[in-house]
Regions:
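Short, solvent-exposed loop/turn elements at domain surfaces
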Residues: 51-57, 141, 200, 281-283, ...
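Helical hinge/lid and interdomain linker segments adjacent to catalytic or ligand-binding clefts
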Residues: 81-208
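A glycine-rich, often tryptophan-bearing local segment used as a flexible ligand/cofactor-contacting loop or short
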Residues: 165-259, 312
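Catalytic beta-strand/loop cores that center a nucleophilic Ser/Cys/Thr
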Residues: 222-306
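Extracellular fibronectin type III
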Residues: 17-39
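Surface-exposed coil/turn segments at beta-strand junctions on protein surfaces, enriched
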Residues: 3-7, 185, 289
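Beta-strand-rich modules
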Residues: 2-20
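Low-complexity, Pro/Ser/Thr- and charge-rich linker/hinge segments at domain boundaries
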Residues: 31-53
Length: 332
């Protein structure tokens, strides 16, 4: 057992070594013990974002067009990308090379040449954990497979934070759905955030049932925001407030977001807490019944600044921990 010093976030990754060299490292898991030492304030952070992918592409034989659709999905580079120079604008296969200034099919803008573009850095438990530590919470972390396969037992943790990032189908595997369903049935609390949770689940009956019946939400829009701005809105939870911004353009710090989910409550005990101001579509919902959930249609780790992440995380953890003055009367 590795020693954990109180008040310091410890992060670990593992690689295999033999005579042939060294393997790619594992994802990074982190752990933190708060100086406050409150046992009921330890969060289990689960990294469910392990996707690596190229950008969305298309091919049309009817009109001889083909290329990459960065506006739909830029993909997810491994750690970072140093080869991307800009979005494609020439899709005609018939367009031939004429000069370095007119490159023909596949020609692209050059506004990102020489820049490092962030991809999946596999360290998001650390980023989420930083915000929790600022609020006085301890945390441990694991991969989604460890939780789904029973290596990690969730029952001893009052809160689970499931990171989904830009994960695609399946966003939450059926086995993990069963694990979370069982955990919540015992009165647990779940925070889940990501770009495709609702949109990718809507076309699959089992996934949709989980979203509606367990998370108590439903899809409002697949492309809910272009500006990357989120505002709080009127709700029974006035302490969840403020304005937040997430990254929508390629940058060296965090993967960029092309589209986010718009969400709606699917239960009378669920409420919208955040909206995208450009169209007033819901960006986040909470449910308070026999268990509590908070579902965000955008990735928490993609928020622009640590202060934004700290502020939003503090509000969400407060929602999970406080006892409401007016007890909800459950209908059996």
């Amino acid at each position: 057992i590795l020693p954990i010093e109180t008040g310091i976030i410890h992060s670990y990754k593992v690689a295999a070594v033999n005579k042939g060299g060294i393997s790619f490292p594992s994802e990074i898991v982190s752990v933190y013990r708060s100086p406050k030492g409150e046992k009921d304030k330890t969060v289990l952070i689960v990294n469910g974002f392990d996707r690596i992918s190229g950008p969305a592409s298309f091919e049309s034989t009817a009109d001889s067009l083909a290329g990459f659709l960065y506006a739909v999905d830029r993909g997810v580079p491994y750690l970072n990308d140093i080869a991307f120079i800009g979005d494609q604008f020439e899709f005609r296969r018939s367009a031939t090379w004429n000069s370095n200034d007119n490159n023909g099919h596949g020609d692209s803008y050059n506004n990102y040449a020489g820049q490092v573009i962030a991809g999946n850095t596999f360290d998001y438990p650390f980023i989420h954990g930083q915000a929790m530590a600022e609020t006085g919470y301890s945390f441990v972390s694991c991969s989604h497979k460890s939780l789904a396969e029973g290596v990690v037992k969730p029952d001893t943790y009052p809160i689970i934070d499931l990171i989904l990032g830009k994960q695609r189908q399946p966003v939450i595997t059926p086995v993990l759905q069963d694990t979370l369903r069982s955990y919540l049935a015992q009165g647990g609390n779940l925070l889940v955030s990501g770009t495709n949770l609702f949109s990718d689940s809507w076309g699959n009956a089992q996934d949709r049932t989980f979203v509606e019946e367990v998370l108590k939400g439903k899809l409002a829009s697949r492309n809910a925001s272009k500006e990357g701005i989120v505002n709080s809105c009127a709700s029974p939870y006035g302490y969840i407030n403020g304005r937040y911004t997430f990254r929508t353009r390629p940058n060296p710090i965090c993967y960029s977001i092309e589209s986010v989910d718009g969400v709606l409550p699917a239960d009378k005990l669920a409420h919208t807490i955040l909206r995208y101001p450009e169209n007033n579509i819901g960006a986040g919902i909470v449910y308070e019944g026999k268990y509590r959930t908070c579902s965000l249609g955008f990735p928490f780790e993609a928020l622009q600044t640590p202060s934004e992440r700290n502020r939003l995380m503090e509000s969400i953890l407060r929602f999970f921990s406080i006892q409401q003055q007016n007890k909800i009367q459950y209908i059996q």
